């Protein structure tokens, strides 16, 4: 372990010394970030060619390692530059960076309450705060049947929601009978590609996916959704999952959650709301109308790492009934049991 006399690890004195240098390096980086070209200035393989072919037999001083960052700089795309407008927003901040150091430095594995009560309870409580801050229905709070959890990305949040929907639609029999041929999922033609991947990973198969037409603003057309659902039911399929998007990646289109939600309620279909891109806008009361209809949602995800100055990766998933997820996902051996 790290201590004042360690011969196998960095000593605590050396850790302090090098830590100051890292903070200085980062502070200097942010002070001059606008001077760098936003996009990387290298060709494929150019950075790797500067690295040793084999791992060194002996370690190097931390000073040398930090100096190597100067070699890496031409190969960096500067996501934190104010001139960066590609892909999606992903802004960090000083408090987030320092908090990440504490989280990494304490080395806690907060996979359940027993492994770190503080980690679990703070996570749960802060996500309850988010429900209030964003004006979301109270059913997403841990004090109700629902609750929230931090995930790495909205892709994994969607996968978890889809598995919950799969088991809900099949009355928990999907894993037993392994028959995906009758379950169907519905998304707009503008939905994120991760949903199609989730459908494949969850075992439904790509043929179960229904792409619903969009209007001139690239939002899902509810009447087209209902038409396809009724046709599938007539053909012997079981509609299991509908995904509405708040801010598509291509065009930031907003699907009409309220109208879609009413259809899902009528046919008892799981409604997942993917607000990864624009959900954080609900922190401002004047934009909450974009999420009207969340009362109908069974699950909801958005990414604080996009607009909330939080380090990547931080996605949050809220569900209206956590037992629908735990019953679908839980495997609890002795070493993972809480008191």
Predicted regions and their residues:
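N-terminal entrance/gating region of PLP-dependent enzymes' catalytic architecture
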Residues: 2-145
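Short acidic, glycine/serine/threonine-rich loops at helix termini
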Residues: 160-163, 196-200, 252-256, 281-287, ...
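PLP-dependent aminotransferase-class I/II
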Residues: 175-241, 251-254, 259, 289
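Acidic/histidine-rich catalytic neighborhood
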Residues: 220, 227, 266, 277-278, ...
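Active-site C-terminal subdomain of aminotransferase-like
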Residues: 293-339
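Conserved beta-loop-alpha segment that forms the PLP phosphate-binding cup at the N-terminus of a helix
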Residues: 123, 127, 143-177, 194-198
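Catalytic PLP-binding core of fold-type I/II PLP enzymes
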Residues: 253-285
């Amino acid at each position: 372990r790290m201590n004042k006399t360690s011969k196998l690890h960095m000593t605590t004195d050396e850790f302090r010394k090098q830590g100051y240098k890292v903070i200085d390096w980062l502070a200097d980086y942010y002070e001059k970030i606008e001077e760098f070209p936003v996009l990387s200035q290298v060709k494929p393989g150019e950075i790797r060619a500067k690295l040793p072919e084999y791992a060194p037999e002996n370690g190097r001083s931390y000073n040398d390692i930090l100096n190597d960052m100067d070699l890496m700089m031409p190969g960096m795309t500067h996501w934190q530059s104010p001139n960066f407008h590609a892909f999606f927003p992903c802004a960090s901040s000083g408090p987030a960076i320092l908090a990440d150091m504490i989280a990494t430095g304490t080395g806690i594995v907060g996979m359940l309450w027993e492994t770190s009560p503080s980690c679990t309870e703070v996570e749960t409580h802060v996500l309850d705060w988010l429900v209030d801050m964003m004006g979301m229905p109270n059913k997403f709070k841990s004090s109700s049947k629902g609750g929230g959890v931090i995930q790495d990305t909205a892709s994994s949040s969607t996968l978890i929601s889809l598995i919950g929907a799969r088991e809900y639609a099949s009355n928990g029999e999907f894993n037993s009978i392994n028959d995906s041929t009758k379950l169907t999922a519905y998304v707009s033609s503008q939905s994120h590609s991760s949903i199609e991947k989730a459908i494949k990973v969850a075992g439904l198969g790509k043929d179960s996916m229904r792409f619903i037409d969009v209007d001139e603003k690239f939002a899902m057309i509810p009447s087209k959704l209902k038409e396809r659902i009724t046709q599938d039911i007539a053909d012997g399929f079981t509609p299991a999952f509908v995904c509405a998007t708040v801010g598509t990646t291509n065009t930031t289109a907003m699907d009409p959650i309220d109208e879609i939600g009413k259809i899902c309620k009528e046919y008892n279909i799981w409604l997942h709301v993917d607000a990864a891109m624009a959900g954080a806008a609900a922190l401002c009361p004047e934009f909450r109308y974009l999420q009207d209809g969340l009362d109908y949602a069974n699950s909801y995800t958005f990414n604080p790492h996009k607009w909330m100055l939080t380090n990547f990766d931080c996605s949050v998933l809220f569900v209206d009934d956590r037992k629908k997820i735990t019953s679908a996902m839980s495997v609890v051996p002795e070493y993972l049991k809480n008191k």
